[in-house]
Amino acid sequence: MEIIPHRHPFLLIDRVLELEPGRRVVAVKNVSMNEPVFQGHYPGNPIFPGVLILEAMAQAGAVAVLSQPEFAGKVPLFAGIDDARFRRPVLPGDQLRLEVEMVAMRRGLGVGKGMAYVGDELKAEATLKFALVDAATPEPAR
């Protein structure tokens, strides 16, 4: 996962299964009971938070985008989330399969369609909007 800037404890993808640079990615997140978030979400009834599923999708999408040589070293930032839907809870022991397809990319701004599955069951989906910035500045890459 050296291609994206995220690190433990906020690196939310464990492995990339398929990659078409700039187009699509399939990655996995193994949801363990040892995740720090389960200390408070929710004790005795642990559920992996939807916002972290969205972040995992975004990190997977970042692998697809940042694997292109022209974007190497850039930092992806959320610019928006549309049509987010959470279908079923994700629980400790689940293997979350993250599928992200890039829909549009122009001048450092992009849109990806993300879906999260456990087995064949769709758990969440969203349209993710992002900006690529230089590591030293908060301005979008041009």
UniProtKB/Swiss-Prot annotation:
Enzyme class: lyase
GO cellular component, one term: cytoplasm
Keywords: Cytoplasm, Lipid A biosynthesis, Lipid biosynthesis, Lipid metabolism, Lyase
Subcellular location as annotated: Cytoplasm
Reaction catalysed by this enzyme: a (3R)-hydroxyacyl-[ACP] = a (2E)-enoyl-[ACP] + H2O
The keyword Chloroplast is annotated on this UniProt entry: no
Disulfide bridge partners, by residue number: none
Chief site of localization: cytoplasm
PANTHER family named among the record's database cross-references: 3-HYDROXYACYL-[ACYL-CARRIER-PROTEIN] DEHYDRATASE (PTHR30272:SF1)
Family label: Belongs to the thioester dehydratase family. FabZ subfamily.
Record-given protein name: 3-hydroxyacyl-[acyl-carrier-protein] dehydratase FabZ
Originating gene: fabZ
